[in-house]
UniProtKB/Swiss-Prot annotation:
Part of the 50S ribosomal subunit. Keywords: Ribonucleoprotein, Ribosomal protein, RNA-binding, rRNA-binding. Disulfide bonds: none annotated. NCBIfam families: L6_bact. InterPro entries: Ribosomal_uL6-like, Ribosomal_uL6-like_a/b-dom_sf, Ribosomal_uL6_a/b-dom, Ribosomal_uL6_bac-type, Ribosomal_uL6_CS. This is Large ribosomal subunit protein uL6. GO terms for cellular component: cytosolic large ribosomal subunit. Coiled coil: none annotated. The gene is rplF.
Length: 177
């Protein structure tokens, strides 16, 4: 039995979970999320807890068991508290500013780089810090990764877009004469 998969998911007050065949729907104060269960996996709702089960010990079933449990748990967490990632823009002349719901970066290119906010994602800008927030953990992480990809941190000078608290492995420059 999967150590993560066998743990029940406790449903907090104010969150409504509906299981309809192979669809799990979670509704809470911050919004609603849906997920379709993979074929061999089943989920049951009893006494304020969701339990995820698998029919057999085949390799595919075992691998999907813990994954499905964690995805449902993240949905419950997302509709109650939400998720956020912080990014820092580091470097001379590197800036970020909010343009309505979207962002505009100056990252040393000959043009400003616009970033549109996907559905369900909000951006907050404080100086050179950007906070990406939303209820879907995967979407928040993917949006933050796409922003970081615009100008990855340089290993020589450390300039670029990085996650808050990320340690950049610096390289020594040329030795010279």
């Amino acid at each position: 039995m999967s150590r993560i998969g066998r743990l029940p998911i406790t449903i907090p007050a104010g969150v409504d979970v509906t299981i309809d065949g192979d669809r799990v729907s979670v509704k809470g104060p911050k919004g609603q999320l849906e997920h379709s269960l993979p074929t061999p996996i089943t989920a049951t709702l009893e006494e304020g807890q969701v339990t995820v089960a698998r029919p057999d010990d085949e390799r595919e079933s075992r691998s999907l068991h813990g994954l499905t449990r964690t995805l449902i748990s993240n949905m419950v967490e997302g509709v109650t508290n939400g998720f956020s990632k912080q990014l820092e823009v580091v470097g001379t002349g590197y800036r970020v500013q909010a343009k309505g719901q979207d962002l505009e970066f100056a990252l040393g290119y000959s043009h400003p780089v616009p970033v549109k906010a996907p559905q369900g994602i909000t951006f907050t800008v404080e100086g050179n810090r950007v906070t990406v927030a939303g209820i879907d953990k995967q979407q928040v992480g993917e949006t933050a990764a796409n922003i970081r990809k615009l100008r990855r941190p340089d290993p020589y000078k450390g300039k670029g877009v990085r996650y808050a608290g990320e340690q950049i492995r610096r390289k020594a420059g040329k030795a010279g004469k």
